[in-house]
């Protein structure tokens, strides 16, 4: 059975009836993390909300006043996951998030168009595709697509859009002679009922369960951004369709305007200016590294030159790295001196190094790490790692001063 959303992809609401409602759980992504949410699985007599399938994400919307968080297909049914229960046999008005739906329609029909043209022009078969949040990707069964080929595909795609080519939805049975003639990547194992064909008049006929525009003019435009290396002997073609092209142009213009202000030159000079900046930064970083190494040596030699230098050396610097700390330890020497060195923000996080006689470092390294709320490891008289509570540095110094006072360290 085709759902109402498949029979009329432009319908934004539907009056229907709740068939069943059962407690359920679902893993939903929030901020990059998946959390298990308790709710209810609702079946309706029919639905205007598209369940995920055919490479197209599911719709969002409302059943009455209850938000629909997911729609998935289970066999012939569309299962709506909601947070609040709904009474069976109740008449409800189902509404969709039209902006999300129409965006998916534009990308999906755009994929059919690009796929058909790539195949007819160059024999590039589509093996899969992904409708992403920002861009869509078509995986082509070819190791290489040239710039000239991309331009030709894009040109014909936009020509078909300007020609207002109609898009028809037809239903056929699996025993229909046409079944073996249309483009398809196969039916799901649990498919039941008639097979849905999306027919771009004179361009393509393809088996598909997704929602599509009724005319290519509704795509507005297609922009192929380029390609990326895909799986073995595959190429990923990246494209935008419809409103996404306009949003991309807007973002690109705003980025260009910001760069013009920051770089103090015109768009045609941005690449050269950034290249010069990168080279300057690289040179400065190299010079800074040399100066830090020299500073590490001078700091260590200054300590060694003091007659009353003692058996403990402690230093904190905001700037530096592990190499800076290890140079100091190497120059001072760790056989007769205990060193506690830290790099980073005094109140938050950074790096630390405890170096000295192996017995002391092995015993107190983990304790220092614990006080600093850090992670680290040690061997051969050195224990180093990352600290999350650099503000506890003074507590470590007190501990190590006590250690020095209670342990004999032979000093030259």
Swiss-Prot record:
Keywords: Cytoplasm, Metal-binding, Protein biosynthesis, Zinc. Disulfide bonds: none annotated. Functions in trans to edit the amino acid moiety from incorrectly charged tRNA(Ala). PROSITE patterns: AA_TRNA_LIGASE_II_ALA. Its cofactor is Zn(2+). Belongs to the class-II aminoacyl-tRNA synthetase family. Alax-L subfamily. Zn(2+) binds at residues 108, 112, 208, 212. The gene is aarsd1-a. This is Alanyl-tRNA editing protein Aarsd1-A. Binds 1 zinc ion per subunit. Its main location: cytoplasm. One of its GO terms (biological process) is alanyl-tRNA aminoacylation. PANTHER family: ALANYL-TRNA EDITING PROTEIN (PTHR43462), ALANYL-TRNA EDITING PROTEIN AARSD1 (PTHR43462:SF1). One of its GO terms (cellular component) is cytoplasm. It is found in: Cytoplasm. One of its GO terms (molecular function) is metal ion binding.
């Amino acid at each position: 059975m085709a759902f109402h959303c498949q029979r009329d992809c432009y319908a934004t609401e539907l009056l229907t009836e709740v068939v069943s409602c059962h407690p359920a759980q679902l893993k939903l992504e929030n901020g990059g993390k998946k959390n298990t949410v308790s709710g209810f699985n609702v079946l309706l007599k029919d639905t205007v909300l598209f369940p995920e399938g055919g490479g197209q994400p599911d719709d969002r919307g409302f059943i009455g006043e209850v938000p629909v968080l997911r729609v998935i297909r289970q066999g012939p049914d569309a299962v709506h996951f909601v947070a609040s229960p709904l009474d069976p046999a109740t008449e409800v008005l189902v509404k969709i998030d039209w902006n999300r739906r129409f965006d998916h329609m534009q990308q999906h029909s755009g994929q059919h168009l690009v796929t058909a043209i790539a195949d007819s022009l160059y024999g590039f078969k589509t093996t899969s595709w992904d409708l992403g949040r920002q861009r869509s990707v078509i995986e082509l069964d070819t190791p290489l697509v040239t710039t000239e080929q991309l331009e030709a595909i894009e040109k014909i795609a936009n020509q078909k859009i300007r020609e207002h080519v109609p898009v028809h939805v037809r239903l056929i049975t699996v025993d229909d002679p046409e079944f073996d003639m249309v483009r398809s990547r196969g039916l799901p194992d649990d498919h039941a009922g008639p097979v849905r064909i999306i027919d771009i008049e004179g361009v393509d006929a393809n088996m598909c369960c997704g929602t599509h525009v009724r005319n290519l003019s509704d795509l507005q435009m297609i922009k192929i951004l380029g390609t990326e290396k895909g799986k073995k002997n595959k190429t990923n073609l990246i494209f935008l369709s419809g409103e996404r092209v306009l949003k991309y142009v807007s973002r690109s213009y705003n980025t260009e305007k910001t760069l013009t202000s920051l770089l103090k030159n015109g768009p045609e000079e941005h690449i050269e200016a950034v290249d010069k900046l990168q080279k300057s930064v690289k040179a400065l970083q190299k010079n800074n590294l040399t100066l830090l190494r020299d500073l590490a040596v001078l700091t260590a030699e200054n300590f060694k030159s003091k007659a009353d230098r003692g058996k403990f050396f402690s230093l904190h610097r905001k700037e530096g790295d592990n190499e800076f700390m290890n140079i100091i330890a190497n120059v001072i020497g760790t056989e007769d001196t205990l060193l506690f060195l830290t790099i980073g923000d005094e109140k938050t996080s950074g790096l630390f190094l405890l170096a000295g006689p192996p017995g002391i470092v092995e015993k107190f390294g983990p304790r220092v790490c614990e006080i600093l709320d850090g992670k680290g490891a040690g061997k051969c008289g050195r224990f180093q790692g990352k600290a999350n509570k650099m503000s506890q540095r003074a507590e470590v110094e007190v501990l190590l001063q006590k250690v020095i006072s209670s342990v004999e360290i032979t000093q030259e």
